[in-house]
């Protein structure tokens, strides 16, 4: 079950105030619905992450929308981002394996960009990642695609699962 640390609890140096914890025992999720977007082609997600177990073969979902059709998740120690029910996929090369490190991820989407590599960007600890996983085709989102990541009334979720 996710643990949310309240504002009145003491910071021990190991707890992050206001943080969530997913323990991978199944079904844990936070969710809601998007409000009215200013632009449904643009989306930014930023969060801190600390890996707690070994390789994730099935995936550890960071963020999803449209009932699971569009996801950002950890898959086999790499970052994968799916659009349009997985028909558009990016799988970045950096291996996320260090269980003692905190990672800061920023996902930035702007499908109005004419250059496909500018439509979806990943930053890890302040560095833009441009290398994709070897042997995996890059399928960037189409230009001007309005994804489920910023659509009024669409559900979104933050969760984890073990595959």
Language-model segment annotations:
Residues 2-163:
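Extracellular glycan-associated modules
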């Amino acid at each position: 079950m996710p643990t949310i640390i309240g504002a009145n609890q003491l910071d021990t140096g190991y707890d992050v105030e206001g943080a969530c914890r997913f323990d991978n025992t199944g079904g844990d999720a936070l969710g809601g619905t998007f409000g009215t977007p200013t632009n449904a082609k643009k989306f930014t997600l930023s969060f801190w992450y600390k890996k707690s177990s070994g390789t994730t073969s099935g995936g550890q979902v960071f963020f999803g929308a449209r009932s699971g059709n569009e996801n950002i998740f950890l898959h086999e120690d790499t970052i994968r981002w799916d659009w349009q029910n997985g028909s558009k996929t990016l799988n970045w090369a950096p291996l996320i394996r260090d269980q003692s490190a905190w990672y800061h991820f920023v996902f930035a989407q702007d499908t109005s960009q004419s250059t496909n590599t500018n439509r979806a960007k990943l930053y890890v600890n302040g560095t833009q990642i441009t290398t994709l996983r070897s042997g995996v085709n890059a399928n960037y989102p189409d230009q001007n695609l309005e994804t489920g990541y910023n659509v009024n009334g669409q559900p979104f979720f933050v969760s984890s699962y073990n595959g």
